[in-house]
């Protein structure tokens, strides 16, 4: 199964509470923190909600 590496590149300060909760649900905390997640519809949906805060790379 494919995986994606999600890295938080912008702060969640002054963001909507739903965006803050999504960042926390993905397992991201501080800026430049990264997490490897499965590439599925649920993960992609969460990433879409905070696309302006994160960078996404495919992991082989």
Curated annotation (Swiss-Prot):
Transmembrane segments: none annotated. The keyword ATP-binding does not apply. This is Large ribosomal subunit protein uL30. Belongs to the universal ribosomal protein uL30 family. InterPro entries: Ribo_uL30_ferredoxin-like_sf, Ribosomal_uL30_bac-type, Ribosomal_uL30_ferredoxin-like. One of its GO terms (cellular component) is cytosolic large ribosomal subunit. The gene is rpmD. One of its GO terms (molecular function) is structural constituent of ribosome. Pfam families: Ribosomal_L30 (PF00327). PANTHER family: LARGE RIBOSOMAL SUBUNIT PROTEIN UL30M, MITOCHONDRIAL RIBOSOMAL PROTEIN L30. Part of the 50S ribosomal subunit. SUPFAM superfamilies: Ribosomal protein L30p/L7e. NCBIfam families: rpmD_bact. Keywords: Ribonucleoprotein, Ribosomal protein. One of its GO terms (biological process) is translation.
């Amino acid at each position: 199964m494919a995986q994606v590496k999600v890295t938080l590149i912008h702060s969640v300060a002054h963001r909507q509470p739903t965006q803050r909760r999504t960042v926390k649900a993905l397992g991201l905390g501080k800026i430049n923190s990264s997490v490897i997640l499965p590439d599925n519809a649920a993960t992609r949906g969460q990433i879409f909600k905070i696309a302006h805060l994160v960078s996404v790379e495919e992991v082989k």
